[in-house]
Amino acid sequence: MPVITLPDGSKREFAHAVSTLDVAADIGPGLAKACIAGRVNGELKDACDLIETDAELSIITAKDEEGVEILRHSCAHLLGHAIKQMWPETKMAIGPVIDNGFYYDIDLEHKLTQDDIEALEKRMLQLAKTNYDVVKRVVSWQEARDTFAARGEEYKIAILDENISKDATPALYHHEEYTDMCRGPHVPNMRFCQHFKLMSIAGAYWRGNSENKMLQRIYGTAWADKKALSTHLTRLEEAAKRDHRKIGKQLDLYHMQEEAPGMVFWHNDGWSIFLELERFIRRKLNQYTYQEVKGPLMMDRVLWERSGHWDKYSEAMFTTSSENREYAIKPMNCPGHVQIFNQGLKSYRDLPLRMAEFGCCHRNEPSGSLHGLMRVRGFTQDDAHIFCTDDQVQEEVSACIQMVYDTYSTFGFENIVVKLSTRPEKRIGDDAMWDRAEEALKQALRANNIEFTLLPGEGAFYGPKIEFTLHDCLDRAWQCGTVQLDYALPNRLGATYVAEDNSRQTPVMIHRAILGSLERFLGILIEEYAGRFPTWLAPMQVVVMNITDKQADYVQEIVKFFKEQGIRASFDLRNEKIGFKIREHTLRRVPYLLVVGDQEMENKEVAVRTRDGIDLGKMRLEDFATKIHQQISLRSLKLLEE
């Protein structure tokens, strides 16, 4: 007689084993109709799975995040159902859930076209609208293998042979005549899967191994209702307009080419923004009392072996050799910073020691994962490492948190999601050390009134971690900032200080990044602002245009004056109509367009308009310079009089 405890604390007693769907029906027909799955004692289960003992139960509907993920997974099976009807010879590989959607990798000789994708989507909708039940069967490993062998599904057989124990009992999900294998859970009925869209086709190697066969990957998105789907598609359209690769080319900020995959060729205007970002962070370092250092780009393999990176990270490291010595180009800055710390005797009076670097790092990312500035092989980290005592951890972490929020707010990012990853099963140190470390991070977050989500077991083996994920104007999540405690690396690399009692102690090391990769953060900013950078960041802040040749000398005097004032300015003296010039510089997203005619020259004025077409009227040159200086010094996100 199981007793089911619901989230509100109420209890329901049943005379026999019940499913989540049974419990939902006992509560009411509306909930039964909405029920997708259940969370039983913290574990997601299919709505049909029986609960035989007392349990805590949360009923999952499409209003829950887990419910949407489940219906996305079921849409992947629906896609498989439709594919097998249209191309029965297809071999199905894997179909997981991804952010905002799903994909399915298939082996099909016929190369799918956009017309095929549209036909597939239509067939999927036809199938879903029949509202058929999804039937789950738990079978033996051998029965599952026999089922897929009879259907010629070689990839499913490979998964069973290579990834699933022979004493396991896999779950088979039957979509009418189509059968798939999955951990689940899945929707009980296809009425939940009617708001989706197939998005694109790409190539993907089986198991991600380039030595294996290339499969076709079909991407889709799925949502709980029509409105959510429409909102997402609108956001995707806006994201396409804001694509940093497209805008980067339009504004001549940077380029990338085949001879240097994942490496950025910065052009003048892009490098101007990069340097402004660097200057901004450098001022923050000074404000928060950091030393700035510079370590070598390349170090001997021996050091990477001592740090542990060679064992755990060597596949992602670029290497070279000279004079019978093997070197690695650094993928991160931390081992180099420990070497700097180790130069000279350190006392407890020297701690905390905050060491920062704009470190040029390289990682051998797979070529298929490279994506503009967002995923590169060569990048610059705004990396810092704080060497401190156990007692100083909370205060130092608190200062890091303040620095993160102070920095993000400058760029207009206010929606920050914070996660705290705690001790994993495999870890160094005793429980007392982890208790102190985790509590210090929690107290630092609470002291700053930061709400956070715990991720139990997700910390690194050498210490707990705080992650900061910012949400942009399209509500996309970008994980940028981290604060990571490290109780291992200082010890491995022999970092010590003399404690107050004259004993030698190992410092705690705090890894801290704010922007993460400057390249990636700049890509985020390009998309956030759609290339319309705030004045302080804009590569060109002012362009001055003449109406006739009579004003040419005066225009050049104005630009010289602006440059002496530290304002990034240029002139346009081309023999073109003023309307043409204005349109061109508006497309270049220059914040301020200044026009000079005879009257402006006579009165030592400029006619000011913004890139948004707002006419700010005539201003004396000095008045405009004062206003724009104030805007730059405040790092305002808005233009004058907006």
UniProtKB/Swiss-Prot annotation:
Cofactor(s) the record lists: Zn(2+)
CDD domains: TGS_ThrRS, ThrRS_anticodon, ThrRS_core
Catalytic activity, as annotated: tRNA(Thr) + L-threonine + ATP = L-threonyl-tRNA(Thr) + AMP + diphosphate + H(+)
Region of interest (Catalytic), residue spans: 243-534
Textual note on the cofactor: Binds 1 zinc ion per subunit.
Residues in TGS domain copies: 1-61
Disulfide bond annotation, renumbered to this chain: none
Subcellular location: Cytoplasm
SMART domains registered for this protein in UniProt: tRNA_SAD
GO molecular function term, any single one: tRNA binding
InterPro entries in the record: aa-tRNA-synt_IIb (IPR002314), aa-tRNA-synth_II (IPR006195), aa-tRNA-synth_II/BPL/LPL (IPR045864), Anticodon-bd (IPR004154), Anticodon-bd_dom_sf (IPR036621), Beta-grasp_dom_sf (IPR012675), TGS (IPR004095), TGS-like (IPR012676)
One Pfam entry name: HGTP_anticodon
Main localization of the protein described in the UniProt heading: cytoplasm
Any single GO CC term annotated in Swiss-Prot or TrEMBL for this entry: cytosol
Source taxon at top rank: Bacteria
Enzyme Commission number, as recorded: 6.1.1.3
Alphabetical keyword list: Aminoacyl-tRNA synthetase, ATP-binding, Cytoplasm, Ligase, Metal-binding, Nucleotide-binding, Protein biosynthesis, RNA-binding, tRNA-binding, Zinc
Binding positions for Zn(2+) per the UniProt entry: 334, 385, 511
Cited NCBIfam families: thrS
Similarity field: Belongs to the class-II aminoacyl-tRNA synthetase family.
Protein role: Catalyzes the attachment of threonine to tRNA(Thr) in a two-step reaction: L-threonine is first activated by ATP to form Thr-AMP and then transferred to the acceptor end of tRNA(Thr). Also edits incorrectly charged L-seryl-tRNA(Thr).
Protein name: Threonine--tRNA ligase
Biological classification of the source: Bacteria, Pseudomonadati, Pseudomonadota, Gammaproteobacteria, Alteromonadales
